[in-house]
Curated annotation (Swiss-Prot):
Domain of life: Bacteria
Protein name in the entry: Circadian clock oscillator protein KaiB
Family to which the UniProt record says this protein belongs: Belongs to the KaiB family.
Gene3D superfamilies on file: Glutaredoxin
Originating organism: Cyanothece sp. (strain PCC 7425 / ATCC 29141)
Keywords for this protein: Biological rhythms
The protein's role, per its UniProt record: Key component of the KaiABC oscillator complex, which constitutes the main circadian regulator in cyanobacteria. Complex composition changes during the circadian cycle to control KaiC phosphorylation. KaiA stimulates KaiC autophosphorylation, while KaiB sequesters KaiA, leading to KaiC autodephosphorylation. Phospho-Ser-431 KaiC accumulation triggers binding of KaiB to form the KaiB(6):KaiC(6) complex, leading to changes in output regulators CikA and SasA. KaiB switches to a thioredoxin-like fold (KaiB(fs)) when bound to KaiC. A metamorphic protein which reversibly switches between an inactive tetrameric fold and a rare, thioredoxin-like monomeric fold (KaiB(fs)). KaiB(fs) binds phospho-KaiC, KaiA and CikA. KaiA and CikA compete for binding to KaiB(fs), and KaiB(fs) and SasA compete for binding to KaiC, thus the clock oscillator and output signal pathway are tightly coupled.
Family annotation (SUPFAM superfamilies): Thioredoxin-like
Keyword Chaperone applies: no
GO biological process terms held by the UniProt record: circadian rhythm
Record remark: domains: Has 2 forms, fold switches to a thioredoxin-like fold (KaiB(fs)) when bound to KaiC.
Subunit structure: The KaiABC complex composition changes during the circadian cycle to control KaiC phosphorylation. Complexes KaiC(6), KaiA(2-4):KaiC(6), KaiB(6):KaiC(6) and KaiC(6):KaiB(6):KaiA(12) are among the most important forms, many form cooperatively. Undergoes a major conformational rearrangment; in the free state forms homotetramers as a dimer of dimers. When bound to the CI domain of KaiC switches to a monomeric thioredoxin-fold (KaiB(fs)). KaiB(fs) binds CikA, leading it to dephosphorylate phospho-RpaA.
Source organism phylogeny: Bacteria, Bacillati, Cyanobacteriota, Cyanophyceae, Gomontiellales
Length: 105
């Protein structure tokens, strides 16, 4: 995959230090380090400590990963352990396929 030229701004909403929250953060960090190679900013928001942020951003369930930039805003709700689902949700997997097809032509 060619280096990404975009900077991704992501928010991960979690509910405390639960096993689901810890697993979501660990999985997401692995994906980001492998796929985004330093061109991302990740903000982790604990909705138990900052319920107003969850309300403002219309977060109804955790964990929720929101891609703020580049547009459009996308949200992945629930289990983040499926790498492919996360990449599709962030529009990254589609870009990989498009680049591979362009190189094949």
């Amino acid at each position: 995959m060619s280096p990404l030229k975009k900077t991704y701004v992501l928010k991960l909403y979690v509910a405390g230090n639960t096993p689901n929250s810890v697993r979501a953060l660990k999985t997401l960090n692995n994906i980001l380090e492998q796929e985004f190679q330093g061109v991302y900013a990740l903000k982790v928001i604990d909705v138990l400590k900052n319920p107003q942020l969850a309300e403002e951003d219309k977060i109804l369930a955790t964990p929720t990963l929101a891609k703020i930039l580049p547009p459009p805003v996308r949200k992945i709700i629930g289990d983040l352990s499926d790498r492919e689902k996360v990449l599709i949700g962030l529009d990254l997997l589609y870009e990989e396929f498009a680049e591979a097809e362009a190189e094949a032509e």
